[in-house]
Amino acid sequence: MTNMAETKDTVQLRLLSLELLKQLWAGHEAMCQSVTRAASESNLDYSSSSNNLEMPLSQETSASSVAPNSQDKRHVWDPLDSHRGDTYDVAWYGKVNSRVDSLPPATCQHQEPQEGLRPSSVPLLATEGLKRPVSLGGPKGLGPDKAQVPRSLPLRLGKLSKPKVTFSQESSVPESSWYSRPCLDYDWTAGSLDSSSPVSSESEAYFSMLQRFREDNREDCVCNSPEAVFPELQESSGVEEDHECVYCYRINRRLFPEPLDPGAPCCLCGIPRDEQGPQTLVEPVQVRVSIPLSIMDPPHQYRIHRRKSFDASDTFALPRHCLLGWDILPPKSEKTSVPKSLDLWSSVSHGAAQRRNLSATNPSYQALRSRVPPPFWSEPQVARLCPSH
């Protein structure tokens, strides 16, 4: 009798648990439908205000809400196939049912999406959170610690929701309104150029007609005469043939004229200089010379103590030749060479000693002395008076 009573109590408990499970499924479906309906309404409101946001995912959310129902129904088992000793599961189902019954008022309340958040993420997160707490305690015997998952559902909604930034697509602006828009520096430069040439707007028929005209009148359109290269030669046809050609020259550092351009034509007859006949060597033509200022007046002045710093043997420049005269000057007289008296004999002896010093130091003075005869000095004769007897 006790075994029969225990069996009846077990069957009755399982029937009660089955009713609780049905209530749980009904609560799940009601909550999913409310969340889906709220998400669809928010998507419609948000899509009307923005044209570039993504389309509302109402179909996705409905499919995701049906998926947990079908997945959760897999956990329903026949009470006849279960084992004994499942009295703890009934109490746990009661706790889960009470928790789920308390969730719909909080989750079904629709909140306006904050600025920058994607409204379509709300139903996805809600349905994702509803998939996990449905794993009921079956033969494997899940503990009560893992049954605390439904309590963290509002926390997941707050933590996993990340803002998503979207950019509006740039509207295409017609080319006709480009000139009215503000331009940068290079845009202003490109716009100021006259790129609207009338020739570029002509049709192909115009260019074909122009080509046929040039082929028919080739002699008039194309000129092969050398006069076309130098059109100024036609103006010089009235110049007399006996004129003197004028060419441009430049004086080099050695004071020799150099032509600026050997192929430059004459400004009167147009004949290049390199085409002149050999008679110009016998009778030179008139030239126009440009002398650089550095040849006439050097930009720097030469100092006397630096007269040995250049070689003036291969130049015709006048300032450099003048500096050569400093080499043949006699040295300056020293203070000790000044005669101490105006006696004639002392002056003559001092001059002879000075000449000997110059001949020993300066060879040019020796050559100059050989040309000039030395001065002749004679002892003055004094007339003696003889006494008369």
UniProtKB/Swiss-Prot annotation:
Record has Phosphoprotein as a keyword: yes
Listed Low complexity bias regions: 44-54
Pfam families: MIIP
A biological-process GO annotation: negative regulation of cell migration
Residues recorded with modification Phosphoserine: S309
Domain of life: Eukaryota
Compositionally biased residues, Polar residues: 58-70
Keywords per UniProt: Phosphoprotein
Entry annotated with the keyword Phosphoprotein: yes
Chain residue ranges for the region called Disordered: 44-80, 131-150
Compositional bias of kind Basic and acidic residues: 71-80
Free-text function comment from the UniProt entry: Inhibits glioma cells invasion and down-regulates adhesion- and motility-associated genes such as NFKB2 and ICAM1. Exhibits opposing effects to IGFBP2 on cell invasion.
Assembly and interaction partners: Interacts with IGFBP2.
Record-given protein name: Migration and invasion-inhibitory protein
Organism of origin: Rattus norvegicus
